[in-house]
Amino acid sequence: MRVKEKYQHLRRWGWRWGTMLLGMLMICSATEKLWVTVYYGVPVWKEATTTLFCASDAKAYDTEVHNVWATHACVPTDPNPQEVVLVNVTENFNMWKNDMVEQMHEDIISLWDQSLKPCVKLTPLCVSLKCTDLKNDTNTNSSSGGMIMEKGEIKNCSFNISTSIRGKVQKEYAFFYKHDIIPIDNDTTSYTLTSCNTSVITQACPKVSFEPIPIHYCAPAGFAILKCNNKTFNGTGPCTNVSTVQCTHGIKPVVSTQLLLNGSLAEEEVVIRSANLTDNVKTIIVQLNQSVEINCTRPNNNTRKRIRIQRGPGRTFVTIGKIGNMRQAHCNISRAKWNNTLKQIASKLREQYGNNKTIIFKQSSGGDLEIVTHSFNCGGEFFYCNSTQLFNSTWFNSTWSTEGSNNTEGSDTITLPCRIKQIINMWQEVGKAMYAPPISGQIRCSSNITGLLLTRDGGNNNNGSEIFRPGGGDMRDNWRSELYKYKVVKIEPLGVAPTKAKRRVVQREKRAVGIGALFLGFLGAAGSTMGAASMTLTVQARQLLSGIVQQQNNLLRAIEAQQHLLQLTVWGIKQLQARILAVERYLKDQQLLGIWGCSGKLICTTAVPWNASWSNKSLEQIWNHTTWMEWDREINNYTSLIHSLIEESQNQQEKNEQELLELDKWASLWNWFNITNWLWYIKIFIMIVGGLVGLRIVFAVLSIVNRVRQGHSPLSFQTHLPTPGGPDRPEGIEEEGGERDRDRSIRLVNGSLALIWDDLRSLCLFSYHRLRDLLLIVTRIVELLGRRGWEALKYWWNLLQYWSQELKNSAVSLLNATAIAVAEGTDRVIEVVQGACRAIRHIPRRIRQGLERILL
């Protein structure tokens, strides 16, 4: 019986506690609803192509062509350039698909076209030239201290030109290099200028020097340039050391083939870069870690001669006048440095193509003179140097020794013989030729070799060797060797993310901006989590606008400082276009914020619920373990949908606010006491009184008219007419009263004012009685509601006390049952232990008793 009672008690206790736990579980399991929140100034970017502008420290007074071009096209450089390192950011780069290379290529073409603009068409010189070899009076090259030109390298040509007198011709002579003329019908004495049959030859302006200056490429506001700082970056793939800059480093636009001159060096080891190392068609770009100096000179002290070939001013052909000596132009390179460079390059190539490979460097396999030789511009003259001595070695896989002319020569200097051409095939356009006027005096230039352009022979080489030859010709590879670590991205400052905050539709409050935001740069928080990056929104949003303003100021300063030289060329139009684009993008973002009801806000809550199908991550995962870049990639497919929902929600909210404002007069009871409203109330009161008086007058007139029509004379308005009695009630005599005493007495008044006052009094009494009845009804309702509410509160209080007592009793019962069970269990354990102890203690007695029985 006792066990049964305990079982029933535990059963009741289990039901109570089970019900309570189930309710608590249902309450706790209810997930808190999330809402979309808009953030402005988030560190998010996307790959983009935009119009870049250039910056340089060009000197307006310098006539060097690069300075002139940069003065017209570029803005001054920033004296304090900033570079912000993006911590915990990994970005993919691809130097072979970089729009910056294409833009620089177009710009350098513009530079050459503008700098070497043609002054004179040489069509009159496309005639038959009678040429002979220039005699060499020097018989030895040792005494002259240099290499002697080959016989026939320079031709002395004569030709006829028109004079100022019509019908007369004049015979002139000029010196031409062998490669600038071609024989006519294999005749050794009759020649014509090369390219006369394929293009129109024009002569560049003679007053030209040619020394490239560094040019910086800058991104407009709203865009940024990402820079990869990995020291061994091969140009493609992910980069873990990323920073953001507004402008690139200074790049010298040196046009050359085979060898890259005056570029940037690798910080550690030699770096090999190629779009596909297994494809022999692709060019291999080698970046050196140590520069090799190359000194070039044209020793012969030539003079210039001018020949008028056409009527009119400026129609002058400039050619070589006198040749000081016949020493050949050449370039000198240190043999030890070059061999050390090839050794490092061969080592890196073996890492790519196999450690057991033998690396062989050979001369160019053929083609145009610009490709076969190392071509470049030195002091205004175009040099074409034979690079066979540079690329004529074999590097074995074990000894790493060399074979070829590099070791057979005993001198410490490699001397490259060079040719000079005056008729140049322009690299920027096929079929275009230009005559570069000769430069008088000696020419010397010193450059640094910072890279190589190589090509690999194709085919199946089973002999364990790889052959590499110098290449070039596509100047995009030259620019690519400097722009490999840059990419342009578009800033996307608008971001959406879920939060617990919902937009309130009450009156707006002033927004307080936190002062704990640190200056990290516009994209400095890109690697931080979303929660940490949201602290820098103020700085980033401010810098987005300040970047636009700063660039506008830079442009205005450039125009003011160089207004006498600045011309609105194609470059000027491109710069204006870039800035207008930046302003338009900023205004577009501000327009979206305005449409969403977020104008002037960095963090803007909305009334759009967050859909778990967009992202099922928890708030802790989103804000503490996710960057804005990762988050943008995750919800990129739903961004347009979220934006449209925010717009719809804002439209609905504005509609609701409009409807609420229409009821604002009823909500603001204090406005009833405004003097303007009181004047309106008095006006309404006067209109009501006037209406009542007018109705009374109308009815009185109608009554008089009615009585006159019936033959009665009009009575006073206040004449009291007796109430007619019924047919069963006799009139009686005057003395016989009784019944008439019960008739209602009516107060009679005299005068119109008294009549008006009586009507007003009746109206006020009527209003008073009705308002009193209404007030009594309202009081009764409030009293009833208060009584019912109080009873409900007392009921809920009693219910709460009851359940509290029940919970208390259940807890006490549980504790009692637990105590009883523990006590009973303890008693059983004690009894068992006592029995065991007694049994052990009685063992000797039992043994003694057994022995006694045996003995007895």
Swiss-Prot record:
Ranges for the region named V1 are: 131-156
Q: What is this protein called?
A: Envelope glycoprotein gp160
Q: Which family does it belong to?
A: Belongs to the HIV-1 env protein family.
Statement: the UniProt record of this protein carries the keyword Membrane: yes
In this protein, the residues bearing a glycan are: 88, 136, 141, 156, 160, 186, 197, 230, 234, 241, 262, 276, 289, 295, 301, 332, 339, 356, 386, 392, 397, 406, 448, 463, 611, 616, 624, 637, 674
- Quick one: signal sequence residues? 1-32
This protein's GO CC annotations = host cell endosome membrane; host cell plasma membrane; membrane; viral envelope; virion membrane
Keyword Lipoprotein part of the UniProt annotation? yes
Note the Pfam families from the entry: GP120, GP41
Instruction: Give the positions of lipid attachment, kind S-palmitoyl cysteine.
Output: 764, 837
Q: Where is this region: V3?
A: 296-330
Q: Name one GO molecular function term.
A: structural molecule activity
Span of the annotated motif Di-leucine internalization motif: 855-856
Residue numbers spanned by region MPER: 662-683
According to its UniProt entry, this protein's organism is Human immunodeficiency virus type 1 group M subtype B (isolate LW123) (HIV-1)
Q: Which UniProt keywords apply?
A: AIDS, Apoptosis, Clathrin-mediated endocytosis of virus by host, Cleavage on pair of basic residues, Coiled coil, Disulfide bond, Fusion of virus membrane with host endosomal membrane, Fusion of virus membrane with host membrane, Glycoprotein, Host cell membrane, Host endosome, Host membrane, Host-virus interaction, Lipoprotein, Membrane, Palmitate, Signal, Transmembrane, Transmembrane helix, Viral attachment to host cell, Viral envelope protein, Viral immunoevasion, Viral penetration into host cytoplasm, Virion, Virus endocytosis by host, Virus entry into host cell
Gene Ontology annotations of biological process type: clathrin-dependent endocytosis of virus by host cell; fusion of virus membrane with host endosome membrane; fusion of virus membrane with host plasma membrane; positive regulation of plasma membrane raft polarization; positive regulation of receptor clustering; viral protein processing; virion attachment to host cell
Q: Which parts of this chain are annotated as the region V4?
A: 385-418
Q: Which residues lie on this side of the membrane: Cytoplasmic?
A: 706-856
